[in-house]
Amino acid sequence: FTTRIWLDCARQGRLAGRAMADQPVMPEDDIPFYNASIIYDTFYSYIGEPHGADGNVYLWQGRGGYRKVRVVEGCLAGALLLKERQGANAIRLAIGEDVSAYGDAIVRPDFPWNDLTGQDWDYLF
C-alpha cells in the first residue's frame, strides 16, 4: 500500500521548497487534505472536509465497510471511507466539483468517480 501519507508529504515538500526559494504558492498547491492509512486491520481514506455542520451528508454501510460523503451547496466537500475505499483518488480530485445532480448515489462504492473526473485514478498507485 503505497499512498499512506505520500501525497501529503509530497505537497508539503513542494510548499516548503517554494517557501525556501521565495517563490509564490501555486494554485495547484491548494489541493484538499488527503490521508490514507491503516487503523488496526481497517484501511481508511480521509479526504477534504467530511465533517461539518453545513451541507448534506450521505452515508453507506455494507460488506463491513462505511462511507460518508459531505456535499455543501451542491459541491463535494469531503469523504471518509473505511474498508470500501473505491474511488478515493478520484474523490480527492473531485473536491469542489458540482455533484448536485447525483444525490445520494455518490456515497455508493460503485459510483463512477473516474467518469466524473475524466481519468482512471484508481490505477495510478
Annotate each PLM feature.
Residues 60-125:
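C-terminal auxiliary extensions adjacent to catalytic cores
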Residues 1-89:
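Mid-to-C-terminal Rossmann-like scaffold of FAD/NAD(P)H-dependent oxidoreductases
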